[in-house]
Design a protein with these regions (language model features):
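Regulatory and interdomain segments flanking nucleotide-handling catalytic cores
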Residues: 1-154
Length: 154
């Protein structure tokens, strides 16, 4: 599962974006959400999705807006699922919390985490698929390249 936690940047000095952000995400991703997008901690929104394509699209949308620090947590969630995202828990939610905290210190305001963290020893053979660190690096490159585009480039 993929948990996206987005924390509004400079929320004390900006308009409240969490309510409209939640509503916009809910409308845009209707039918692709495991649970409804929820507002958490006042200035945060959180979403739970089951597929990587939706998670990536949501990360790209939120970071493009420029108003959010975005954490992507990947892992399992505790079942049975509650009715509200803010009531759900599990390793993916813990990872998303760690990721959004790291995102606040990132130039792209994005970070990815898994729980438990996965690491490869130097002597391990490379896996067939990229690990979390490689995926985060690729997304960071994508975000940096995208941020250099002019409005006319869109």
């Amino acid at each position: 599962m993929f948990v996206i936690t987005a924390d509004q940047k400079a929320s004390r000095h900006d308009i409240d974006r969490a309510g409209s952000g939640r509503d916009d995400l809910a409308a845009r991703y209707e039918g692709r959400l495991v649970l409804p997008v929820d507002r958490t901690s006042g200035d945060e929104v959180q979403a739970l999705v089951a597929d990587a394509a939706t998670a990536l699209d949501m990360v790209l949308l939120l970071t493009r807006a420029g108003h959010w620090s975005v954490g992507l947590g990947i892992g399992t969630v505790r079942t049975p699922l509650p009715r509200a995202t803010r009531e759900a828990t599990g390793p993916a939610f813990i990872a998303a919390r760690d990721a959004v905290t790291a995102a606040k210190r990132s130039a792209t305001r994005f970070a990815l985490a898994t729980d438990p963290p996965t690491a490869r020893a130097d002597d391990d053979p490379p896996p067939a698929l990229p690990g979390p660190a490689e995926v985060e690096a690729l997304l960071t490159l994508l975000l940096l390249a995208r941020d250099r585009r002019t409005p006319q480039g869109w």
